[in-house]
Amino acid sequence: MSGFDELARRYLASWNERDPVRRRALVDELWTDDAGYVDPIVAAEGRDAIEEVMATAQRQFPGLVYRPAGKADGHHDVARLAWELAPDGGPAVIVGLAVMVTERSRLRRVHGFLDPVPAVTTSPGAGR
């Protein structure tokens, strides 16, 4: 497994982790202190905000899981990962692409692209 494949596996595992304590541990392990995440509907700066976006997405898309839609690849500290959001074993309802900027094997920035862009917001705190 390449370093980028392992990074992608851990990235998706953090989005799928339902337990807030375990999810936070994954975020702290995977992301740099000054990390940022953006997609068409949210911008999050710092690990607290990134973890809250993940929690909010889980509340808004209950029963769906993030899974890879191919192998991750990359070069020069930048990786890309095609992924899907779907019911376990079912067809994808959203497909996406994560462009991951890394620093010492950790995530520094992730730029997400979604198709289709959901009508709901994943702004931190939404869906509570």
Segments predicted by a language model, with ranges:
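C-terminal and inter-domain tail/linker signature
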Residues: 1-128
